[in-house]
């Protein structure tokens, strides 16, 4: 995959290559769009740091585009269908919804850490819509929803990759289609975490338990969380 189309600076291109090398060692070859099934035993963490304006968010967005093009499944915080264990997957995270919204405005389907640690339980009737939007089933017929409502849901999901937003566009409330939340038990594959300067040790440990490959994007000039004694979680990562 050529970097020329990305319009990255030399520093960004170096960081891209570093991340691509880590991903290749984890079985995701971005140069050749080749994917190897994940290995449960292999764990890796990387930190890509730079001050505000250095282009971390653009770099994250381009890495997301490359993984998506290679065929990696994208994990959405507001819906997760059945996954094959041999499929590679990526979750893009931020500590707060505000930070996740910045990425979503760039077309990057980001979610919050909380939405990954806890997964929603869908009402079976409305889960049919989610499965259809996610591409795993045919278009359903749902009592009380018109074809126009389903079209709005489809258009919204294609534009923003938000399942909750798509169902809201169809005229549903969260309390209609989400019946509860449960703590995640099964592991995930790859994660990109933006605004890693806001991450505390407990969140970092939780994410390392869930993900086999974790890439942090952070600003060393920001203030650390109040319970971190001035230290960033990525300070000790090489």
List the model feature ranges, each with a label:
Residues 1-238:
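Conserved ATP-binding/catalytic motifs of P-loop helicase motor domains
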């Amino acid at each position: 995959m050529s970097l020329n189309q990305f319009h990255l600076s030399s520093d960004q291109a170096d960081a891209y290559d570093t991340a691509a090398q880590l991903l290749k060692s984890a079985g995701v070859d971005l140069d050749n769009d080749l994917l190897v099934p994940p290995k449960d035993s292999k764990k890796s963490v990387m930190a890509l740091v730079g001050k505000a304006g250095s282009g971390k968010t653009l770099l994250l967005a381009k890495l997301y585009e490359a993984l998506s093009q290679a065929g990696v499944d994208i994990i959405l915080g507001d819906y997760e269908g059945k996954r094959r264990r041999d499929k590679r997957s990526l979750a893009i995270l931020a500590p707060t919804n505000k930070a996740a919204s910045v990425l979503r405005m760039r077309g990057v389907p980001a979610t919050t850490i909380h939405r990954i640690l806890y997964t929603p339980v869908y009402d079976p009737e409305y889960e049919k819509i989610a499965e259809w939007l996610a591409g795993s089933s045919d278009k359903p017929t749902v009592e009380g929803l018109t074809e126009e409502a389903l079209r709005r849901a489809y258009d919204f999901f294609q534009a923003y990759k938000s399942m909750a937003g798509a169902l809201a566009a169809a005229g549903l409330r969260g309390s209609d289609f989400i019946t509860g939340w449960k703590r995640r038990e099964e592991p995930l594959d790859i994660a990109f975490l933006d605004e890693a300067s806001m991450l505390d040790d407990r969140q970092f440990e939780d994410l390392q338990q869930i993900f086999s490959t974790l890439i942090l994007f952070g600003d060393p000039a920001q203030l650390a969380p109040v319970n971190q004694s001035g230290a960033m979680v990525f300070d000790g990562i090489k």
